[in-house]
């Protein structure tokens, strides 16, 4: 696990080594154990390293045998050992046990597309082809690892950190009004956009090619979920896939643990992991209210599988102390309440392990969310999208069968999703039009006639990479903890999405196929228990937060976020507080947005100052073309 960063600057013709170092060290929490760089004229690349595999010899960059390919990576390639053996059979010589070295030789042997199609992992990759003078960037299939980029005439920059780019003097930090509109609707910014106009996100399953002589990115999709297939898989085959996925995610040269909520998904992972590594550490979080607390089930599972279990408590005082810390850990706003206890859990787990496995992805793959059960009666995605962007005739001009319910909670959880007027009052005239990415999304979804498959696929393309994995990555990396999601294995995802609807839902029972195979490892009490969901007493906590600030109105009036009418935000908050906090998700999303923006601007100002100092330092200092430690 690392953080990567790089620049191409043909305007200046070179990159200040001190500037590169400063950009790299923005990500020190992503990689506190080491660093590496590559400098050659107008091209500069660097990384911070969290040592997980081959602690002694895994420093980056890695080169091909001829030295013409330079490889950096953030993440893990889980099938690197199999790829390594194939390359060794082709007479490639390895000098380490690092998975990143496989990328350098694999690129030489198979090219970028051939390499990417062979990878099972979570990654953001940067590979420089010195022969063709091209930089290749790629992000993993399901968006587990972040990768941002920006470009202007003669300049291109990329990073695992959005902040590292936003502080560059040639990058505008203007808030994107359409992104603000989407945040108010969804509580995250989906797709290739970010909250800033000038900074884009590499999509999950996307790669970029950038010429070092003309650094304008060319975008290519190398992976798209296959829709339309329907295939039943035997319990034996599915169980073997899940077991192999967990086993591959246990590979590390540092201690590994499991986040154990007590629900089905994490319990399956913990049980398999405990079979592979007896007495493995497991971690759970509890709450004051029994209606929100699954910890008793987590303790039951931990006792059954014999894990070394650690339990932590989260309450209102934790909320008050952690909200500013969570906001500071984010480089983009995500209004997801669950990241608060997750931040705490990651902090405590890091005292015991360096890697933690979690159950992200299972609800999307095997249809675990409650709203999937109501998909047949939900309004269509297309109608919602049409309402959100103010196109009431959208359903008439496009196929009406696209999808039934994209959001991972009931519509009441996102009160502004279809309320265009409400969002316009909060954010002025920033009404978003349908983007090229959304048009492509709708066309892709139309390949499947199975509305349940389309609902899950929508979540896999939006909610999963742009909320769940952002939350998981940022909260874990804030504590230099590597988070891994075993269900997000290409074979498990493809197999799960292709299962017939009856293998996912049967009346009130969700995740039918996963529950059946879970009986191999877990007691019926856990296997048969309905999904509880992750719900915090946020309404009460928000009321207490704003009381401590004087009032909701006073809090928002005293703070400013470009693109938001703070007077209207204050009015909405005051009205909702007086009514008993009916729209707690919206209030939390607005509170998080404000806390994030205040923190981000403070960090950006300080980083910009450090960039200026670095840029004015003597360019004549001798810096090796490559280095690591």
Regions found by a protein language model. Give the residues of each.
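Adenosyl-5′-phosphate
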Residues: 1-4, 21-22, 167, 176, ...
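Short low-complexity, flexible loop/linker segments enriched in glycine and/or proline
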Residues: 324-328, 350, 373-374, 541-543
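Short acidic/histidine-rich active-site segments
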Residues: 353-369
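A mobile, often basic/glycine-rich helix-loop segment
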Residues: 365-392
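Conserved A3 ("GATE") glycine/threonine-rich loop of ANL adenylate-forming enzymes
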Residues: 99-102, 124, 363-364, 389-393
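Generic hydrophobic alpha-helical membrane-span motif
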Residues: 37-39, 146-149, 268-271, 365, ...
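Acceptor-substrate binding/catalytic loop of class I
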Residues: 332-336
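Cysteine-centered catalytic environments shared across enzyme families
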Residues: 1-330, 342, 346, 519-520, ...
């Amino acid at each position: 696990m690392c953080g990567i960063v790089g620049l191409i600057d043909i305007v200046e013709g070179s990159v200040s080594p001190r500037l590169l170092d400063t950009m790299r060290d923005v990500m020190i929490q992503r990689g506190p154990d080491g660093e590496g760089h590559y400098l050659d004229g107008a091209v500069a690349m660097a990384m911070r390293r969290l040592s997980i595999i081959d602690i002694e010899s895994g420093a980056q960059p890695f080169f091909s045998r001829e030295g013409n390919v330079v490889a950096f990576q953030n993440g893990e390639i889980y099938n690197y050992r199999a790829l390594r053996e194939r390359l060794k059979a082709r007479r490639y010589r390895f000098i380490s046990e690092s998975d990143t070295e496989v990328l350098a030789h694999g690129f030489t042997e198979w090219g970028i597309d051939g390499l990417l199609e062979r990878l099972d992992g979570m990654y953001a990759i940067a590979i420089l082809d010195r022969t063709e003078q091209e930089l290749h960037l790629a992000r993993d299939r399901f968006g587990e690892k972040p990768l941002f980029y920006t470009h202007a005439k003669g300049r291109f920059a990329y990073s695992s950190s959005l902040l590292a780019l936003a502080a560059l003097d040639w990058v505008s930090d203007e808030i994107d009004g359409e992104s603000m509109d989407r945040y108010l609707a969804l509580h995250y910014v989906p797709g290739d956009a970010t909250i800033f106009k000038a900074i884009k996100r590499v999509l999950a399953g996307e790669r970029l090619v950038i010429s070092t002589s003309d650094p304008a990115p060319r975008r290519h999709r190398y992976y798209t979920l296959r829709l339309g297939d329907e295939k039943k898989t035997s319990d034996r085959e599915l169980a073997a896939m899940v077991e192999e996925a967990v086993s591959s995610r246990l590979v590390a040269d540092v201690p590994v643990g499991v986040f154990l909520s007590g629900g089905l998904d994490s319990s399956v992972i913990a049980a398999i992991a405990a079979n592979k590594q007896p007495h493995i550490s497991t971690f759970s979080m509890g709450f004051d209210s029994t209606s929100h607390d699954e910890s008793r089930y987590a303790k039951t599972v931990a006792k059954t599988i014999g894990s070394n279990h650690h339990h932590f408590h989260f309450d209102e005082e934790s909320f008050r102390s952690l909200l500013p810390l969570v906001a500071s850990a984010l480089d983009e706003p995500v209004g997801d309440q669950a990241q608060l206890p997750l931040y705490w859990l990651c902090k405590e787990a890091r005292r015991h392990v360096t890697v933690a496995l979690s159950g992200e992805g299972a609800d999307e793959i095997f249809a675990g969310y409650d709203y999937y059960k109501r998909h047949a009666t939900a309004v269509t995605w297309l109608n919602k999208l049409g309402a959100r962007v103010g196109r009431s005739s959208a359903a008439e001009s496009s196929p009406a069968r696209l999808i039934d319910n994209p959001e991972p909670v009931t519509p009441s959880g996102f009160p502004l999703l279809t309320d265009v007027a409400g969002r316009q009052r909060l954010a002025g005239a920033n009404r978003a039009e349908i983007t090229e990415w959304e048009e492509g999304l709708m066309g892709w979804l139309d390949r499947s006639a199975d509305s349940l498959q389309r609902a899950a696929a929508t979540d896999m393309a939006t909610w999963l990479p742009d909320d769940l994995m952002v939350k998981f990555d940022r909260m874990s990396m804030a504590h230099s903890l590597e988070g891994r999601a075993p269900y997000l294995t290409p074979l498990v995802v493809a197999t799960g999405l292709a299962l017939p609807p009856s293998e996912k839902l049967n009346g009130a029972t969700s995740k039918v196929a996963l529950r059946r195979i879970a009986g191999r490892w877990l007691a019926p009490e856990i296997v048969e228990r309905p999904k509880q969901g992750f719900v915090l007493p946020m309404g009460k906590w928000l009321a207490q937060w704003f009381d401590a600030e004087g009032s909701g109105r006073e809090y928002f009036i005293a703070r400013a976020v470009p693109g938001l009418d703070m007077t209207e935000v204050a009015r909405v908050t005051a009205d909702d507080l007086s009514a008993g906090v009916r729209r707690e998700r919206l209030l939390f999303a607005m509170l998080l947005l404000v806390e994030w923006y205040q923190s981000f601007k403070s960090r950006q100002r300080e980083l910009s100052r450090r960039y200026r100092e670095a840029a004015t330092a003597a360019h004549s200092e001798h810096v090796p073309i490559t280095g690591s430690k």
